[in-house]
């Protein structure tokens, strides 16, 4: 999207508590150890200290001197110096580009529209950032079509059924491998609820990221796979590009009072090794460094 030496990376999770923020923080820390100049923003607000459903602590973003952040005016904390102002507004005020003058925790409330995100990224790179990280979500996934790399997170908090998790990863590989199609006036925004009338026809979809909005990834996958078996063809004008899938064995376990943190004793990397998209558990060994190399386009 931008120049060769400027990389934008989006992160989203298929559910809450699947390690999206942990993956982003791991990438951030490893990129910093490689000497990269970093910028960070969020599609929407990300600043709660406690998960409003489970009551468990949420990972926090701590940035260092020289890092850049795009956040709303009311989220600015001491130690941030505004270097550029955008024309993007949120309920928490204008989105500002700021540079850290001391190490501090940051609260993010960034642009949530594609054009507004593009403005923030352009400003980041004009201020010298080499890698811009974007904390996104499945509910607001469309702006992430803008980024150069897309990291998708899933895990036991999404489903404790290993067979279902495998099928979902299989579905993600399927969606990401659909052939690129030429622009067409008949391109579909979303998958029809009833695909039978299209039997034997070519189905062209406009945006690959929209597959992730399906309430039933497996059902959608099986429906499209059946369409191929019935002689139809599939294509995507703007394909779904997933650079890596991060996985987490963490899940919030119901307790007497709310929830408590728990982990399933399973090697998800091994269980999902069939995936052509790299599957990474950033909590395991050196896999955080491996994910950072994928972000930079130098590993897999």
State each model region's role.
Residues 243, 274-300:
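A cross-taxonomic marker for long C-terminal extensions/tails that follow the last structured domain
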Residues 38-43, 109-110, 131-136, 152, ...:
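General beta-strand structural signal in soluble alpha/beta enzymes
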Residues 23:
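Hydrophobic positions on the alpha1 helix immediately C-terminal to the Walker A/P-loop
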Residues 113, 117-274:
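Conserved catalytic-core segment of NTP-binding enzymes
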Residues 8-15:
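Short hydrophobic/aromatic beta-strand immediately N-terminal to the Walker A/P-loop
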Residues 18-19:
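Conserved glycine(s) of the Walker
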Residues 27-99, 299:
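N-terminal phosphate/diphosphate-binding loop that engages ATP/GTP or pyrophosphate donors
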Residues 1-3:
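Pre-Walker A adenine-sensing motif
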């Amino acid at each position: 999207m931008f120049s060769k030496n400027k990389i934008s990376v989006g992160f989203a999770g298929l559910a809450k508590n699947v390690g999206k923020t942990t993956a982003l923080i791991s990438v951030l820390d490893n990129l910093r150890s490689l000497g990269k100049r970093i910028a960070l923003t969020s599609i929407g607000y990300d600043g709660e200290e406690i998960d409003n459903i489970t009551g468990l602590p949420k990972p926090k973003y701590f940035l260092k001197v020289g890092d850049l952040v795009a956040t709303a005016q009311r989220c600015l904390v001491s130690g941030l110096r505004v270097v550029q102002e955008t024309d993007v507004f949120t309920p928490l005020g204008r989105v500002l580009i700021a540079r850290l003058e001391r190490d501090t925790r940051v609260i993010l409330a960034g642009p949530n529209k594609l054009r507004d995100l593009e403005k923030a990224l352009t400003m980041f790179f004009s201020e010298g950032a080499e890698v811009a990280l974007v904390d996104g979500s499945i509910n607001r996934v469309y702006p992430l079509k803008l980024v150069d790399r897309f990291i998708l997170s899933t895990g036991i908090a999404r489903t404790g059924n290993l067979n279902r998790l495998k099928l979902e990863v299989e579905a993600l590989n399927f969606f990401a491998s659909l052939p690129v199609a030429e622009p067409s006036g008949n391109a579909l925004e979303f998958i029809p609820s009833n695909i039978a009338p299209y039997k034997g026809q070519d189905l062209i979809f406009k945006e690959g990221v929209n597959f992730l909005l399906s309430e039933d990834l497996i059902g959608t996958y099986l429906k499209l796979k059946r369409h191929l078996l019935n002689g139809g063809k599939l294509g995507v004008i703007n394909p779904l590009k997933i650079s890596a899938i991060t996985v987490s064995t963490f899940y919030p376990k119901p307790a007497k009072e709310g929830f408590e943190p728990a982990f399933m004793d399973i090697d998800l990397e091994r269980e999902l090794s069939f995936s052509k998209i790299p599957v990474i558990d950033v909590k395991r060994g050196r896999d955080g460094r491996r994910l950072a190399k994928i972000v930079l386009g130098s590993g897999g």
